[in-house]
Structure formats: C-alpha cells, structure tokens
C-alpha cells in the first residue's frame, strides 16, 4: 500500500475533487447491462430557486436510496430537472426590468419571452450547481426542463386528449385571483396569514317594514355590494316564519331575498350569512344550488366596477372604508368586533388574494381523481407512512374542478385557437395559423398559459420521452419510489397518479415516501420573517457536506419533522474525523507490499476471537441496516452504521488489535489482523457511502482504483454469531463496560489505575479474563484484575453484576469518599430540581396542546434521561455510604 490519506480531513478539498471526478467519469449514468432497474425522478425545483433546507433533506433521502440500489447492481436512473415556475420566473424578470424603469408591457409578448429565456440561460438554474455540492448522484446528461420541446409536446397532447373527452372545459367559477399580478394562482401559492381584523355586524332592513332588520356579520363589507341573497338554515326556528321576506340591500337600490340552505351554521353569529356568489367559493356553490345569478363588483385590478355604484373606481380597501362610513352614517352597523382570521396572500408578492368569479380553463377532476383513488385502494400505490393514505382519500373525495389557466406570458400557452372571421374555435396539439373551417389566417391563440402544475404532473413519463415509446420509458416507468413532503400530496402527487393511470395505464411510482419538515430546535417553521432560516450551503461549508447529510438522515424519524439542532452537526463532524483518523491508523500500519485480499478461506482458518467478534458485529450491523432500509427508516440505518464504526470498530476492535497491528505478536497474527482491519473498513465504508459519499470515496480510493460508488453492496461474513470466540469477546466487552461505568459513577479519575476483583466460577469468564488480561488492563485502565470467588465484599467496595457473576471495585484509598459523596449529593439535588421542572412542564395542558409534537417528544426524552441520571446518582451515594 503506497497510498495514504492526509493528516487531517479537509472536507472542501475532498468534495471538490470527487464532484469533478464523478462527473468526468460519468459515474452516475445507468448501467445498461443490468437486469433490474431502479428509478426516481427528482421533484423539479423552480428554475428561480436556490437550495433550501427542505431540498437538502429531500434530495439526501433520494441519494441514499439511489446509491444503495446502484451498488446492488441495478440500472439506476435518478433523473434531474427544473420547473419553469411560471409566475415566480415572470416576477423575477419583471423585477429586473423595473431596475431599468421598464415594464413587461413595454415589450411584445415574444420579446418578453425571449428576455425570460435569456435570464434562464444566464442566471437560472443556480440550484443545479448547489445540488452537485450536496453530492447528488444524478445523471446530469438527462437533465430536463418543463418547457423543453419534448415535454411541451407531452403537455399539448394531454391537453388535447382531455379536452376531446370533455375533461377540460372553459367556464366561469371562483378562483384565487391576485389583483397585483392580475392572474389566477394555485392554492399552493396562497399563503394564509393570521390577521387581526374586524367582524362587522350589518343591519339589512326588511323591505316594507319600518325599523325591522336582519343582522348579518361579515369581514369584507365592500363585497356586500355584490350580495344577491341572505341565507338561513331551514331548521333555524328564528327565521322559518320569514320565508317570503325580501331585504333592502344597504347602500344600493336593490332588494334581495331571504333564502334557506343547510350549509348555513345556525350556531355561528346570528345564523345568517350573506350570499355573494361572485366573491366567495362557498357562496358560489350555494348560489348554483339556489339558482342565483352572480354579481361581480370588482375589476381584475382590485378596484370596484360599475356594479358597485357610487363606489366605482375606488380601490377595494378604500371602498371598504367608505362603505363602513356610509353604513355608520345610516345607522346600519349594529356592532364591530375584533376578529382574528386567516387571510389569503400571494406567497410570491404578498398581495391579498380575492376569491373571484372568472372565466377560466378547468379540468373536470372527479373522473381522474377516481382513477387515483382506485390505484391506492388496490395497492398499486403505497403511501409510507400509511397514515397519509387517509389524508389522500379525504382530499380526493372533496376535490373541486381545477383551474389550469394563468394570465401570464411565461409558460405553456393554452393550445386553443379562435378564428376572428368565422368564430370557429379549436384545440390542437400543433400551432394553428389557418382556420380549418373558413381558411382565414386571422387566427388568434388563447392568451393564457397553463398552470405550472399541469406540466409537472406529467413529469414521471414526459421526462422519459412520452408520448414517444422510448427505451427509457419502457425500462424506467413506473418509477420505483417518489420521495416528497406532505405539503404537495394534493397539488402534485395526486395529479401525477391521475395522469399516470390515465395515459400510461399504470401509476407513476409504486411507493410514495412522505417525510416531515425541517423545523428549528423549538419546532417552529423556518421563515424569513421570523429570522430563523438555515442556509444548507453555510452548514455544508462549516461542518462538511457529509456531516450535514448524515445529520439529516440520522435525525429523520418516520413521517415526523426534524428539529434542527446545530450542535448535532458538530457531533457528526467528529464522527467524520473519527473515521478519517482510524482509516489513517490502519493505512499507516499496512506495508507497501500489502494487498487487501479480504477474508479468504486461508485467512478465515486463522481468525482469532477478536476477529470473529468484529465480523459478527458487522453482520449484525448489516442486518439492522438492511431491515431499516426495507422500511425506509433512515435514522435506524444511520444509527446502525454509526454505532458499528464508532463503537464496535474504532473503540473496541482497533484498540484490541493494536498489539497485533504493531507486529508485537506473530507475523501470521499480524497479517490476519491487517486483512480483517482493511476488509471490515472497506465494507463499513460501503454501508456508510450512501450517507457520506465524499469521505468514503476518498478513503476507499486508497484501497481500490474502482470508485466506491459502483462497487458491489457489502455482504455478510460466514461467521457464527454464537461461536466461542464471539462469546468471549462479548463477555470482555461487558466486563470493560461495567468497570468503566463503575469508575464514572464513583468519581474515579481517568488517570488512576484500579484493582478489580471478579467473583465468578464460570469457565468462560476465567478463560476470557486470562486470555485477554493485557487488553482488559488497557481498555479499563486497571492496575490488575483477578478472579477470586471467595473474596469478601467490603463496605467501601463498589459492586456491579454481570451475566457470569460480580465485579468488585475497592474504593478504599482510590477516592476521597466524603468529598465524592458530597459532590454526588449536590449533583443529585440539581438533577432532581430539573426533573421536577420538566414534570410540571409536561403536565401543563397548555404546553402539550401548543408545542409542536417533536418539541414535546424532545422534552420527554430529556425527562427520561434525568430520571435515569437521578437513579445512577442515588446508587452512587448508596455505594459510598456503605
């Protein structure tokens, strides 16, 4: 072995080296010769985006899965790409133009779109570079963009097909309207903020009845101008006698009826609601049931229109003030209450969203939703954790038609064409320039573009070449698993299942792995306004990418949120250094002539008990790792490999084997030890690689010219877990651990050598202690250890039971008993006080109901640790008391 690694682990140097080498060697391209396939498509990030903590978690999980399957010899395709992000990208470019005092409308549509493409090619896609920094093993040669020619072809084919079936239509419905951007936006782009507002109780005069009113409460009095009825519950006895009553709509010359519908909650407020079908989704549905004609009182820019009478031209919020002043002047406000309610805002600009009646393009979604429900019910698609299936079904059963048109310029233009001459209308997959009815060239395309989600719902098969029947499509569809957050189950996951079932007659993936969010250590969502946002690139630079990736996986409980605790990152950086230093120790003790041949039959016959033990411990680690992998329990996988490398391998085996590695025993024993050291390290690196790709590749490169990314997945060793050698080493480990605990509990200084007596008549204990006396003295920091079944235990002795007898640690002369007892009593008092505070906190209903579940769980873990600590301290005091 001529190669060596550096004195210190320098993450940035190692990361830059391997990012370049992997790409140069095309290490992540699928193996076309493999019989089995494994594929994942990355949820396409926005072209405007940068890597945030959610991306880092999501992509790390996917990379772990992909790297494992690649090492298992499968043809692995992890397909990257970006979403054109219609409104987000258009807003970015418009902001750039504003710096030059220009507006979008200063350009033709074609000129503006050209500018967006220029921005995309020059400044967009920053996230791609950041994904490489995270170590993502995607096949970059297959990167896709939702506006690519092939993907656009798929979009137009799907639109035409759904339109021809009557599943896409143009109609008038309530949508989320942004007056600032003057476009419809998706539900996902509406951010609901808790807002301190007012609840206005307005008197509606009964027509023809002097001084008789019905009181209706509203938070949006300006929309009252568009009321077409007031509604009560048909079972509300307060109003059943008023069935034929007509009301004077305040501030207008109109009369509106009092009607009855069961959707009204008779327990809320006065039990009456205003019906404004053009400005409220529930009112629109009620209006359709009751045969009411909507009345729109607002312009697209948020000003009041001609139907608002004297308020025409006023901004909606100015109109609110004027309406309230006029109502007050007429004595038509009964009362005003403070009211906290959720107000929808455009997440990309902050403007208050209006529920707005508009003519748009819609997908008749129920028939498609039924296909998705059937796919999940039949087991073709499995949600992990399973609890998310219930959420999925609830959403699907209450789904409404989907507004797919956006009043933007950037995006897939709706493939519908209108002839100005003969009024002929048609939908076509290809551009129409000549009317197919009259031959006129006066054909206008629809001005709107499609919702970004329309193209991204086709992502699993459009990226593989559909509608063409490509080899990629045949081999990699359906994909193996989708990894995503719960927040887009409705917006993206469900729609992908619908489209897969509709156009591929198969779901787009077999499993949907739902992970939680990353929150701050107090359980709060990361938010720029709160100021608690964590930049993953900063963390990667500070602690190393491998430490950061391992943290994300190791702290990810199934289906729950991660609480971001930066101190854990420091611990995993230490883990990286531990691996590096241990690897360096092994390499330094390998001669230039050493060749790692593994555990061959020739080596196997000369294995010593400590060798058999570490091989069995690796087998146990591998079993736990594989079991956790089958359940997507990444934290258990991380725990298994962490405990094996740090505990079994570094802290135990390397310490035990040092005399042999140093050549202080027979040459054959040294040779076997070095083969075991190197082979166990190589296999452990193979398990760790999906979590820590950079460090493992660097260390592995010393042993082999083949990159670890494509070496076979580690296998178990042919060693029995209950062999005599393994039993002896398990017993040795137990004895050393017990002695270490006794030393700690009794305050014995680390540099003080102790004398220990073992009371046991068991032959295994005797042979283990005699054969490993040197190791025992070294590992437990002992002056001596002897077996004495007749030893009489003294008052000042500390005693601990192990599986084969008792371990006695005489404390006389070793510590100042009175001083140590006082220290333990002080520590006990402090711990009991902390324990009491935590118990009070965890019995407080307010804390339990308001705190995030992860925070509550963290506090419970703290309490459990304190309870254990209190017991240990009491035991220590009891020992010292004799």
UniProtKB/Swiss-Prot annotation:
Residues reported in the UniProt entry to bind ATP: 528
Short name of any one Pfam family annotated for the protein: tRNA-synt_1
Catalyzed chemical reaction(s): tRNA(Val) + L-valine + ATP = L-valyl-tRNA(Val) + AMP + diphosphate
Gene Ontology CC annotation, any one: cytosol
PROSITE patterns reported for this sequence: AA_TRNA_LIGASE_I
Short motif ('KMSKS' region): ranges: 525-529
One MF annotation (Gene Ontology) recorded for this entry: valine-tRNA ligase activity
Coiled-coil ranges per UniProt: 812-881
Ranges spanned by the short sequence motif 'HIGH' region, renumbered to the chain: 45-55
Annotated InterPro entries: aa-tRNA-synth_I_CS, aa-tRNA-synth_Ia, Anticodon_Ia_Val, M/V/L/I-tRNA-synth_anticd-bd, Rossmann-like_a/b/a_fold, tRNA-bd_arm, tRNAsynth_Ia_anticodon-bd, Val-tRNA_synth_C_sf
Enzyme's top EC category: ligase
GO biological process per UniProt: valyl-tRNA aminoacylation
EC assignment: 6.1.1.9
Cell location: Cytoplasm
Keyword hit for Flavoprotein: no
Role this protein plays: Catalyzes the attachment of valine to tRNA(Val). As ValRS can inadvertently accommodate and process structurally similar amino acids such as threonine, to avoid such errors, it has a 'posttransfer' editing activity that hydrolyzes mischarged Thr-tRNA(Val) in a tRNA-dependent manner.
Domain observations: ValRS has two distinct active sites: one for aminoacylation and one for editing. The misactivated threonine is translocated from the active site to the editing site.
Record's protein name: Valine--tRNA ligase
This protein's encoding gene: valS
């Amino acid at each position: 072995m001529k190669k060596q690694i550096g004195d210190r682990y320098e993450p940035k140097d190692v990361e830059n080296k391997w990012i370049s080498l992997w790409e140069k060697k095309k290490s992540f391209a699928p193996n076309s010769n493999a019989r089995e396939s494994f594929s994942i498509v990355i949820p396409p990030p926005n072209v405007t985006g940068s890597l945030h903590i959610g991306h880092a978690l999501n992509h790390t999980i996917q990379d772990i899965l992909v790297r494992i399957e690649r090492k298992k010899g499968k043809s692995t395709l992890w397909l990257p790409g970006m979403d054109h992000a219609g409104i987000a990208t258009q807003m970015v470019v418009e902001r750039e133009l504003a710096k030059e005092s220009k507006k979008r409308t200063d350009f033709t549509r074609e000129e503006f779109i050209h500018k967006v493409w220029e921005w995309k090619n020059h400044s967009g896609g920053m996230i791609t570079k950041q994904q490489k920094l995270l170590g993502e093993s995607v096949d970059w040669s297959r990167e896709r963009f939702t506006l690519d020619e092939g993907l656009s072809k798929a979009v137009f084919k799907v639109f035409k097909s759904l339109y021809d079936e009557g599943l896409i239509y143009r109609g008038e419905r309530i949508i989320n309207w942004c007056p600032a951007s003057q476009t419809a936006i998706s539900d996902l782009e509406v951010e609901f903020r808790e807002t301190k507002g007012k609840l206005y109780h307005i008197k509606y005069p009964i027509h023809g009845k002097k001084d008789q009113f019905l009181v209706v409460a509203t938070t949006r009095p300006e929309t009252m101008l568009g009321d077409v009825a007031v509604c009560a519950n048909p079972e509300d006895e307060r109003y059943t006698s008023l069935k034929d009553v007509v009301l004077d709509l305040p501030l207008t010359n109109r009369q509106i009826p009092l009607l009855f519908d069961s959707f009204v909650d008779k327990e809320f407020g006065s039990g009456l609601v205003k019906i404004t079908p053009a400005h409220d989704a529930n009112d629109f549905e009620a209006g359709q049931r009751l045969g009411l004609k909507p009345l729109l009182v607002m312009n697209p820019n948020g000003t009041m229109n001609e139907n608002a009478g004297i308020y025409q031209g006023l901004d909606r919020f100015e109109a609110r003030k004027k309406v309230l002043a006029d109502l007050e002047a007429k004595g038509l406000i009964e009362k005003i209450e403070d009211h906290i309610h959720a107000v929808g805002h455009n997440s990309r600009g902050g403007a208050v969203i209006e529920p707005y009646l508009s003519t748009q393009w819609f997908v008749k979604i129920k028939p498609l939703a039924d296909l998705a429900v059937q796919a999940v019910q039949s087991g073709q698609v499995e949600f992990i954790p399973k609890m998310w299936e219930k959420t999925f079904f609830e959403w699907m059963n209450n789904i409404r038609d989907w507004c797919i048109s956006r009043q933007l310029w950037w995006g897939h233009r709706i493939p519908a064409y209108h002839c100005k001459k003969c009024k002929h209308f048609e939908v076509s997959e290809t551009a129409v320039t000549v009317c197919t009815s009259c031959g006129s060239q006066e054909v206008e395309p629809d001005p709107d573009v499609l919702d970004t989600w329309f193209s991204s719902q086709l992502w699993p098969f459009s990226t593989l070449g559909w509608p063409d029947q490509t080899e990629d499509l045949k081999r990699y569809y359906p994909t193996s698993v989708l990894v995503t957050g719960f927040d887009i189950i409705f917006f993206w996951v469900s729609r992908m299942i619908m489209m897969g079932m509709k156009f591929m007659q198969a779901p787009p993936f077999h499993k949907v792995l739902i992970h939680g969010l990353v929150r701050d250590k107090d359980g709060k969502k990361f938010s720029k306004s709160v100021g608690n946002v964590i930049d993953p690139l900063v963390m990667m630079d500070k602690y190393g990418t491998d430490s950061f990736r391992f943290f994300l996986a190791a702290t990810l409980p199934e289906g729950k949120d991660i609480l971001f605790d930066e101190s854990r990152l420091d611990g995993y950086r230490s883990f990286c250094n531990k691996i590096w230093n241990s690897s360096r120790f092994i390499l330094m003790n390998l001669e230039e002539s050493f060749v790692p041949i593994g555990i061959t039959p020739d080596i196997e016959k000369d294995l010593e008990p400590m060798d058999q033990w570490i091989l069995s411990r690796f087998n146990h680690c591998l079993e736990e790792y594989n079991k956790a992998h089958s359940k997507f329990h990444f934290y258990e996988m991380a725990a298994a490999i962490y405990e094996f490398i740090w505990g079994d391998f570094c802290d135990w085996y390397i310490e035990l084997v040092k005399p042999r590695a140093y050549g202080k025993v027979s040459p054959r024993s040294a040779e076997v030890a070095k083969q075991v050291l190197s082979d166990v390290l190589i296999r452990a690196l193979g398990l760790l690689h999906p979590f820590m790709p950079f460090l493992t590749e660097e260390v592995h490169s010393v042993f082999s010219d083949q990159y670890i990314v494509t070496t076979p997945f580690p296998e178990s060793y042919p060693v029995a877990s209950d062999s005599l050698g393994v039993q002896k080493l398990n017993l040795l480990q137990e004895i050393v651990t017990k002695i270490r605990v006794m030393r700690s509990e009794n305050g014995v200084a680390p540099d003080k050598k102790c004398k220990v007596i073992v009371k046991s008549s068991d032959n295994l204990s005797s042979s283990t202690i005699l054969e490993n006396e040197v190791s025992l003295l070294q590992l437990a920091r002992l002056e001596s250890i002897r077996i004495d079944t007749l030893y009489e235990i003294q008052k000042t002795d500390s005693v601990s039971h192990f599986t084969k007898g008792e371990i006695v640690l005489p404390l006389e002369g070793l510590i100042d008993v009175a001083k140590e007892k006082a220290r333990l009593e002080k520590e006990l008092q402090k711990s009991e006080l902390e324990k009491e505070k935590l118990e009070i906190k965890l019995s407080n209903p307010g804390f339990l109901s308001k705190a995030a579940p992860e925070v509550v769980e963290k506090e419970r873990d703290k309490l459990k640790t304190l309870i254990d600590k209190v017991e240990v301290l009491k035991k220590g005091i009891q020992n010292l008391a004799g």
